[in-house]
């Protein structure tokens, strides 16, 4: 592997680690980069799980040390996600691209509405969050989705934790990272068994994710909810613009890769 490709993998990993820890959608960058570098989409999707696992492991350790969420709640919500994750990974069919775009667009709109009108929503500060039975069903479906697509799962979790469970955005991000960390090894194992992991790409990119996640999770408390809200809003708007065709993240990133290489 050429040194400049290695640098690109690590640096992009740092950026993705920061984006995913504070908001979500970083996997769009990762998968786009991997395919631009020549990996088949299925291998790119599988290889992405290495970075996802390492990044969420790192952020989870930091969030636990800082006491930013209730660990019991995290484990309870992880159980249906794990079950759904295994089922989703074993499903042979893939979701129709048009259906995916519609669903992803709805999730982005929900997040946008929350970020704009959150002052009118009664937020439950702290860790005394009440988990309702239907929340487990939602997390089961989220786990299924994450098992075979993954891209955008962070926004699905944020949509439920912010809008329905009424968590503050810092706690919601901590729960999001923990749940994804617990569930990812199950889908990662499926991709490993099927030989759809490129370790030469995945490990350097994963190391970058660790660095970015350490940075973001460490300073999340100091930056405060206002900064995280603004950061999330910017990322969501970029993803939404890409989704409706105002910009093309794939074309932009591919052009950058062409210049660098």
Regions of interest found by a model, annotated:
Residues 46-99, 184-235:
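Selective hydrophobic functional segments
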């Amino acid at each position: 592997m050429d040194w400049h490709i290695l640098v690109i993998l690590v640096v992009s990993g740092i950026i993705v680690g920061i984006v995913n820890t504070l908001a979500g959608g970083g996997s769009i960058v990762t998968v786009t980069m991997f395919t631009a570098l020549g990996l088949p989409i299925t291998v790119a999707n599988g290889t992405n799980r290495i970075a996802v696992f390492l990044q969420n492991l790192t952020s989870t350790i930091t969030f636990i040390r800082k006491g930013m969420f209730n660990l019991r709640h995290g484990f309870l919500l992880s159980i249906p996600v794990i079950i759904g994750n295994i089922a989703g990974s074993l499903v042979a069919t893939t979701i129709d691209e048009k259906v995916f775009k519609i669903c992803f667009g709805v999730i982005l709109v929900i997040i946008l509405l929350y970020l704009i009108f959150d002052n009118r929503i009664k937020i439950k500060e702290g860790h005394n969050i009440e988990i309702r039975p239907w929340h487990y069903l939602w997390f089961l479906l989220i786990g299924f989705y994450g098992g075979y697509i993954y891209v955008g799962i962070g926004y699905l979790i944020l949509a439920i934790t912010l809008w329905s469970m009424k968590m503050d955005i810092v706690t919601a991000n901590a729960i999001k990272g923990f749940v994804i960390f617990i569930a990812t090894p199950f889908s990662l194992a499926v991709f490993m068994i099927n030989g759809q992991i490129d370790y030469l790409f995945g490990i350097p990119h994963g190391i970058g994710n660790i660095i970015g996640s350490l940075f973001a999770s460490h300073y999340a408390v100091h930056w405060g909810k206002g900064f995280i809200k603004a950061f999330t809003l910017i990322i969501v708007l970029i993803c939404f613009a890409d989704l409706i065709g105002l910009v093309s993240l794939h074309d932009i990133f591919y052009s950058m890769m062409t210049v660098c290489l």
